[in-house]
Amino acid sequence: MFDNFNIEKYKQISFPKDNSLRTLGEIKRLKLMPLNKVLPFKYDDIGNVFQNIFSHRAESFPYRVVQKLIEESEPVIKKIKNYHNRPRPNVNAKKFKIDLDYLKMKSAQTPAFPSGHSAQSKLVALALTDIYPHLKREFDKAAENISNSRI
């Protein structure tokens, strides 16, 4: 599905250097945020989040379509992550001698950028909107919740 996906434009995305004042500012802002220990786990399983939208509806959840999108987009996202090799905030915080609380999650073991959960949830939301356009608002909200749970 994504065999010929061109990642070149994603290589052009820039972010502050790991040891920059801007990165320090980002870490300090994260330090001020309370650590939410519920949302990251609630929204960790992307397929399940979208499947829940269908739990009270007559429409059937296209499980295979969603799983295929998630599985086949993973190598592309990992390729972009490995290209940028952006450390997770807790790793950068240590470089500034800042103790940053974070949740150790199995799904958070790759470089931080881009967020795989954000990318995949948006991809799933777009695909499901093509199938069920009348549920667009709910799909977009689910993708937004998934993205925000990764902060």
Where do the language-model regions lie?
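Membrane-embedded catalytic cores of phosphoryl/pyrophosphoryl-handling enzymes
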Residues: 93-151
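Secretory-pathway/luminal and periplasmic proteins that interact with or process carbohydrate-rich
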Residues: 75, 89, 149-151
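Solvent-exposed, acidic/flexible segments
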Residues: 66-69, 73, 117-121
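N-terminal transmembrane-helix/juxtamembrane module of multi-pass inner/ER membrane proteins
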Residues: 1-70, 77-94
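Polar/charged alpha-helical tracts
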Residues: 8-9, 52, 71, 101, ...
